[in-house]
């Protein structure tokens, strides 16, 4: 059983690094509709990126969080293609 909690993106986290909080997504899924409905499936530790309006985190330590927002675009990838 998984216990989840919802956080607002303005709540502080133990990871306050600007680079970590920038909006990005490595695993973006979109519908084929026009406009597309896209969501990021990335899991981040303890918080979601700074633009996330609806963040869901597990209560584990560290928390595993996913942004539940739906947009009509994908954010740029978090990892560079050269990695």
Curated annotation (Swiss-Prot):
InterPro entries associated with the record: Bowman-Birk_prot_inh, Prot_inh_BBI
PROSITE patterns assigned to the protein according to its UniProt record, in alphabetical order: BOWMAN_BIRK (PS00281)
Site for Reactive bond for trypsin, residues: 32-33, 59-60
Tagged with keyword Disulfide bond: yes
Disulfide links within the chain: 24-78, 25-40, 28-74, 30-38, 48-55, 52-67, 57-65
Keyword Disulfide bond: yes
Pfam families linked: Bowman-Birk_leg
Alphabetized UniProt keyword annotations: Disulfide bond, Protease inhibitor, Serine protease inhibitor
Gene Ontology terms: cellular component: extracellular region
Propeptide boundaries: 1-8
Gene Ontology molecular function terms on file: serine-type endopeptidase inhibitor activity
Protein family according to the UniProt entry: Belongs to the Bowman-Birk serine protease inhibitor family.
Name of the protein: Bowman-Birk type proteinase inhibitor D-II
Organism for this UniProt entry: Glycine max
């Amino acid at each position: 059983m998984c216990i989840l909690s919802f956080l607002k993106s303005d709540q502080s986290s133990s990871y306050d690094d600007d680079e970590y909080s920038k909006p990005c997504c490595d695993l973006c899924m979109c519908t084929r509709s026009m406009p597309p409905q896209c969501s990021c499936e990335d899991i981040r530790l303890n918080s979601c990126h700074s633009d996330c309006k609806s963040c869901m985190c597990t209560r584990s330590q560290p928390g595993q969080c996913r942004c539940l927002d739906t947009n009509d675009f994908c954010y740029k990838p978090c990892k560079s293609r050269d990695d």
